[in-house]
Amino acid sequence: QLNFSTGWGRRYADPNADPMAFLTKLIQIEARKLSGCSN
């Protein structure tokens, strides 16, 4: 979970990052929120 957080931060800050990877991370975060396990 911590590794995923740092990877997400890097992608979020890099405008040249892979958009599909960005969307995948975003979807994973939303899924965690919906399941009540955001943190």
Swiss-Prot record:
It comes from the Eukaryota. It is found in: Secreted. One of its GO terms (cellular component) is extracellular region. The keyword Disulfide bond applies. One of its GO terms (molecular function) is hormone activity. Keywords: Amidation, Cleavage on pair of basic residues, Disulfide bond, Flight, Hormone, Neuropeptide, Pyrrolidone carboxylic acid, Secreted. The modification Pyrrolidone carboxylic acid is found at Q1. GO terms for biological process: flight behavior; neuropeptide signaling pathway. Its main location: secreted. Coiled coil: none annotated. The modification Tryptophan amide is found at W8. Belongs to the AKH/HRTH/RPCH family. Adipokinetic hormone precursor-related peptide (APRP) can form three type of disulfide-bond dimers: p1 (alpha-alpha), p2 (alpha-beta), and p3 (beta-beta). This hormone, released from cells in the corpora cardiaca, causes release of diglycerides from the fat body and stimulation of muscles to use these diglycerides as an energy source during energy-demanding processes. This is Adipokinetic prohormone type 2. The lineage of its organism: Eukaryota, Metazoa, Ecdysozoa, Arthropoda, Hexapoda.
